[in-house]
Amino acid sequence: MGYRSDVRIMTTKKGFKELNKYVKDYLSKLNHDEYNLLDNLEFKAENDYAVYFGWNWLKWYDGYDSVDAIESGLNHLRDKDMSFRFARIGESYDDYEEDSYESENEEEQDLEYPSMNREFDDSYVIEEMERVS
């Protein structure tokens, strides 16, 4: 089954197009049909300025070509002075990772940061208690 994570990324619309192009080029250079995460988003919201997207319950491992393509693409956005926000929540309570870049270009500024809540799932615990009674 493996360890799973939830991932959220925020870019400008221009940044999303650049990331998409970069990831496609990155994966095509591997000379095999690799799964493109950007073609398989589980979550996407956008407005006139920004795109907020991500995946739930994903194997986000270094060394997976699809993951490396996204991470390399975010570094590419940084190199091109394009803002982004990245957050990953792992299964373990203390497993949280984030990265971001704020462009000096006014058109690329003021992106929201991903927001997360961790909370108790009381209904699950109560159901399990009732099940074993």
Tell where the protein language model's regions lie, with residue ranges.
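Charged interaction segments
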Residues: 23-133
